Amino acid sequence: MTMKKSRERHGFRATLALICASATAATATPLVAVDVGHTLQAPGAISARGRSELAFNHDLARKVVDALHALDVRTVLVNADGRIESLQARPASVPQADFFLSIHHDSTNASELTEWDWMGTPQTFSDRWAGHSMFVSTRNPDLATSLLCGRTIGARLQRAGLMPTDKNARRRAYLDAEHAVHAFDNLVVLYRAQQPALLFEAGVIKHRDEELLLRDEARQQRMAQEIATGLKACLTAGR
């Protein structure tokens, strides 16, 4: 073999190795399924000013997808049209995802609500509770990653000044009190998922002041960026 042919073969092998490495890196990029909680037929809680939880969920889920894209994390939006009726069908529709994140907004017990009039329409509110919280299931096949991602998201949110609520500790035990991660073992979208999964409650829409914050686009973007940053850190740790 001539020296020229040897160099050509070596160059080809080097190029092939680079292509393979690039393909491997692309494959290793995590895929996050972002689920819009609730449906058109069952739109969830109604805010203090009469807006459906589904509308809040859709707005934030879209921003989380955009924030993940900005960090070069692949995403798939689940229930974008609000028509997936089955909770089990949500994670089942994305078996290839590396993580399942379900976006929700919180309400308050009926016994804690007060009636008021908003723009001529009777509504209900409670200003007792405000803040985000998270849920994972110990029945999920990868509880460790589910909990780790909850912790990293919680840490990022609090570092940015977005504080959690302890409202849900009345019914759901903490797995990590500092970062507001609770156990919700029988929540279908969490334990039916084939991948680590977390349900995120962005805030309490029955709280009149927090509702306005949760509707603010700049704050939604800020929250989405912290969620995305925490989630990427969790999913790429050690890769």
Role assignments for model-derived ranges:
Residues 30-50:
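Short glycine-rich His-centered loop
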